[in-house]
Curated annotation (Swiss-Prot):
Organism per entry: Shewanella oneidensis (strain ATCC 700550 / JCM 31522 / CIP 106686 / LMG 19005 / NCIMB 14063 / MR-1)
Keyword annotations from UniProtKB, A to Z: Hydrolase, Iron, Metal-binding, Protein biosynthesis
Annotated binding of Fe cation, by residue: C91, H133, H137
Annotated protein name in UniProt: Peptide deformylase 3
UniProt-recorded Gene Ontology molecular function terms: metal ion binding; peptide deformylase activity
Enzyme Commission number: 3.5.1.88
Top-level taxon in the UniProt lineage: Bacteria
GO biological process: co-translational protein modification; translation
Keyword Iron listed: yes
Catalytic residues in the record: E134
Cofactor note: Binds 1 Fe(2+) ion.
Taxonomic placement: Bacteria, Pseudomonadati, Pseudomonadota, Gammaproteobacteria, Alteromonadales
Database matches in Pfam families: Pep_deformylase
Length: 163
């Protein structure tokens, strides 16, 4: 396994949209690297493939206290959403910056697990927020795009200072 470099704004590769994975067997090593990279961070609870420069549609999430229960989702899609929730978010691609973001309170996501089995997750807790955040990355969006232009500029300035 290898720790991959995490892209930070304003890297244009973060705007690329992920493509559906057709051969899950071929990306098993990459999935391991993505998990290892997430665990290598101090506080990362999720990571999308596009954050490390890949266009394979894969996200990994681990909300466990022990950080040893990764959830791997290949080709995830939000198929239902409802309600509204406002909460503070941060991002490994925007180090040192946090802001309040409005998200859906409840989501239903369909995906494949790392063995290629179809799964469905319906949640209205913190996982719902993390799923939306990571799936946004697969669509070429970072969370600050949900903010005003001024707040986006502040985030960019903080990242440049942090680098």
């Amino acid at each position: 396994m290898a720790v991959l470099d995490i892209l930070t704004i304003p890297d244009e590769r973060l705007k690329r949209k992920a493509q559906p994975v057709k051969d899950i067997e071929a990306i098993q090593g990459f999935i391991d690297d993505l998990i290892e990279t997430m665990y290598h961070t101090d506080d990362g609870i999720g990571l999308a493939s596009t954050q490390v420069g890949s266009t394979d549609a894969v996200i990994v999430i681990d909300l466990s206290e022990t950080r040893d229960q990764p959830l791997v989702l290949v080709n995830p899609e939000i198929v239902e959403k409802s309600g509204e929730y406002v909460g503070e978010e941060g991002c490994l691609s925007i180090p040192g910056y946090r802001a309040k973001v409005t998200r859906f309170e409840k989501v239903k996501v369909t995906a494949l697990d790392r063995q290629g089995k179809a799964i469905e997750i319906e949640t209205d807790d913190f996982l719902a927020i993390v799923l939306q955040h990571e799936i946004d990355h697969l669509h070429g969006k970072v969370f600050i795009e949900h903010l005003s232009t001024l707040k986006q500029q502040i985030a960019l300035k903080k990242v440049r200072k942090y680098a």
